[in-house]
Each structure stands twice: as C-alpha cells, then as structure tokens.
Regions:
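Dual-mode signal for accessory low-complexity, basic/Gly-rich regions
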Residues: 162-341
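Active-site bordering "gate/hinge" segments
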Residues: 1-194, 203-206, 293, 327-341
Length: 341
C-alpha cells in the first residue's frame, strides 16, 4: 500500500452553474455556424463534473482524493441532402482555465466538416496510411488491450509470449504515467490502495511490461505494477492511466511530404480487430495524399492489415498532445491494403 499520497493537482474549485454551461455550448455552436459552408449544427455541449473518491481496504489502507473535469464539444453539418458531411471538435481538461476557447472548438469543428465535402471514391490498392492523432490513439487502445494482464492470463493476446521481444522499431516508446500533474488519467494511488509509478510498456521497440493489478500479477507469477481500476460495484481489474506513445523525430508535414501516393485517415468505423491473430480491418474516411500533399476527401473505404506487421512498420511524428487519457502522435504505417472500388 501507499504511505504518502502525492498531490497531482486534480481538482479545480471553480464552479459553473447551468446557465454558464449553456452559454458555453451556445458560444461554441455559434462560432461553428459562422464558418462558410456550414449548413447546420449537429449540436454542441459543455459539461462539468466533480468527483470525490475514498478507498478503505482490508489491509489497513484508507485514503481519498478529488477530481474535476470540464469539457466542451461541437459537431457541425455541411453539404447538401445528397452528400451531407458531419465532423466535430472536442476538448477536456481538469482545470477550467486550461480548456480550449469555445470559438476555437466551434471553428475547428466547422473546418473539419467543410473539408470533408464532395468526397470521392478511390480504387483498391496497397498504400501508405497516415493516422491523424484523433484516430491513431485507437491503435494505442489496441496495444493497451494486448498488454493487459487479463488478456495475458487468458492467452487472448498475440503478445502473450513476447515479453522482452522486439515488437516495434527502436524509436518507439510507449509509457504509462499516473503521476502527470493535471493529467486526465492521473491517480495518486490505484484502486487497491497501492503506489503507482511511471513505467515503459514498450522501450526502444521492445516489450517490457504488462498492465497488472494484484490478481493478474499473482496469476502470472510476477510483481504487480499497481494499475487496479474499479467501479462502485465491480471487482478491480488492470487499466492504464495516462498512456501515450512518445513523440518521434519527424514532423507530420515531413511524413506527408515524403508520400507520393497515400491515405490520411481522420475517421474510423467498426471494430474489426482480432487481438488473438492481429487481423485488422476497419472502415475509414479521410483524405488522399498525392505527391506529398493532402488532396481530396475520401470516404467509404476499408483499411486492412495485421497488427504484428503494422507495429513493426510504425513511424511516429513529433506532434504528441495530451488531450485524452490515451494519447498518440500522428502515425505512419507503410504498405496497408485499402479496399475501395
């Protein structure tokens, strides 16, 4: 158990009433509606939550902490009845003053939407695929599931026998850090009252750690790294905190400029991922890359590959931002299959 509970600055005393929250949502929506090409709003929202958590365990631990969260989001509509497009922007922070300005969220949602108008179909091909950060984090989510102690104990992960093996190229580092000040996934102790420390899941491309709680560590016969998470009525199970792929050494613009013929993914649909075999197939939308530049919008394609190969070929940009509890920079994966027309 933990002896000294760290202060991670996870609670903002600032309070918004319902009218102020409504005004924030309206401001966000109005800024989206001002952008040329937007035909309607798909809704805007703002929220505030305050949580007080206290844990007492049978082995003598008793401690607690408070968390706050503020968020705003907006979704806009553009195009016509024959080809209607929608997209969004969103921000979430522990402290209200750190939240992105409403005008910026609305404007970004609108610009994202307008840029998708008049999409084209593309032919089936092998192509380099660039994942925008808002969808590249889904790859990190798959990694999180693959290294979760429950998956390893059950044998339902293709990484279960790969500890200390090379999974990625040597530039890839994947970290879980519960101690980030004002972090959306930060916790001063895990949900079994144990001390939590930062650790590398992937270090220089090599698999170094599972995500474990007490139960899964005992099942696997190794030391726990204290990642227990639970609800009010559920048993603890391992879960990441602030998990992220470290920034690489190349910019997003450099990655795109080096691609003659590729696909930039901004949207993913469906759940066609098999964590036992690694087979990966998901519906996608985004933009064609031609001669090193973002070209026209593309929709209704499927991107496919195998996670084992995708991890091995993964290249990361230097644009990591912490917007969620799982965060990733722009990711390039060469030679994926794109199923189009």
């Amino acid at each position: 158990t933990i002896e000294t509970i760290p202060n991670l600055d996870l609670f903002d005393t600032y309070d918004l009433n319902s009218d102020e929250l409504k005004d924030l949502a309206l401001e966000t929506e109005n800024s989206a509606l001002k952008v040329k090409g937007v035909t309607n709003s798909n809704g805007a929202s703002s929220s505030q939550s305050k949580t007080s958590f206290h844990l007492s365990t049978s082995n003598g631990f008793s401690g607690g902490y408070k968390k706050s969260n503020f968020s705003i989001s907006c979704s806009a509509i553009a195009g016509n009845e024959l080809s209607m497009q929608t997209d969004y922007d969103y921000d979430s922070k522990v402290f209200f003053k750190d939240l992105k300005d409403t005008s910026l969220v609305g404007k970004q949602a609108a610009e994202n939407t307008v840029s998708k108008c008049n999409p084209k179909k593309i032919k089936t091909c092998k192509s380099d695929v660039v994942f925008d950060p808002r969808v590249s984090r889904t790859l990190l989510s798959h990694i999180s599931s693959l290294v979760n102690g429950v998956s390893i104990a059950r044998g339902s992960s293709f990484l279960s026998e790969k500890m200390n093996s090379k999974i990625f190229n040597k530039e890839i580092n994947i970290i879980d850090n519960p101690n980030i000040v004002k972090g959306l996934g930060s916790k001063p102790f895990d949900d079994e009252g144990c001390e939590m420390k930062r650790f590398n899941i992937i270090e220089n491309g090599i698999l170094k750690s599972w995500i474990l709680d007490t139960t899964t560590s005992q099942q696997l016969g190794i030391k726990s790294n204290s990642r227990a998470s639970r609800g009010m009525s559920s048993s603890p199970s391992p879960s990441p905190t602030n998990m992220f792929i470290e920034s690489g050494s190349i910019s997003k613009d450099e990655i795109i400029s080096n691609i003659k013929d590729g696909f930039y993914v901004t949207d993913l649909i469906g759940q066609g991922v098999n964590l036992i075999t690694g087979d990966y197939s998901r519906g996608a939308g985004g933009f064609k890359i031609e001669n090193g530049k973002i070209s026209f919008p593309v929709n209704e394609v499927t991107i496919a590959g195998n996670l084992k190969d995708m991890f091995n070929r993964m290249i990361v940009a230097n644009d990591l931002e912490f917007k969620y509890s799982l965060n990733s920079p722009t990711i390039l994966i060469e030679g994926m299959t794109i199923a189009g027309i």
